[in-house]
Design a protein with these regions (language model features):
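Conserved short hydrophobic interaction patches
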Residues: 16, 20, 107, 111-118
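Exposed beta-sheet edge/beta-hairpin loop segments within beta-rich domains
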Residues: 69-75, 134-139
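Extracellular/virion structural assembly segments
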Residues: 75-79, 87-110
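Glycine-rich, aromatic-bearing surface loops/beta-hairpins
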Residues: 118, 122-157
Length: 158
């Protein structure tokens, strides 16, 4: 059975995030500044123990909602709201946790905006908002980013 269009989109985003490595280029000759060690999907109720277990630069993707709108001619437009949570840690006491968080956040943004049509799987994706994860205990830190991903589907191509 072939995967749904939504699943292909989410798998492509997951692949992009997994490719964030210092040895890979975000675009042209701009290399990523971080290495993403672990990517997970639909991980709820994250605990401090989960963060410690998965190590540095752990990224979680959660589907938040979908909104369907009919289009003329029988097509439908679907807007998926995707939550991306990034966790990292300062490995040395002298490391600036804010700088480490910003670096991972930037790399995820570069990976997402590299091709806003995700190899023609969607019409576009757009960053919506970002905020810090509250109640983190040093040396751990995190952020939450939200993206809207819009695609059009017709007939059985759901």
């Amino acid at each position: 059975m072939e995967s749904s269009k939504k699943e292909k989109i989410l798998a492509r985003i997951e692949s992009r995030i997994r490719d964030i490595k210092k040895t890979n280029f975000a675009y042209d000759e701009v290399a990523y500044a971080t290495n993403v060690g672990y990517v997970d999907r639909q991980f709820k109720n994250i605990t401090q123990q989960d963060i410690k277990q998965h190590g540095t630069n752990w990224v979680v993707m959660n589907e938040i909602s979908e909104k369907w709108n009919p289009l003329i001619g029988g097509s439908f437009e679907n807007k998926i709201q995707l939550q991306i949570i990034g966790f990292t840690q300062a490995l040395q006491e002298s490391d600036n946790l804010g700088t480490i968080i910003n670096s991972l956040q930037k790399d995820i943004m570069l990976a997402m905006l590299k091709d806003v049509e995700l190899d023609n799987l969607c019409s576009y994706l757009m960053p919506v908002s970002t905020h810090a994860v509250e109640n983190m205990i040093y040396p751990y830190g995190g952020f939450v980013m939200y993206y809207d991903i819009t695609y059009v589907t017709q007939g059985f191509e759901i």
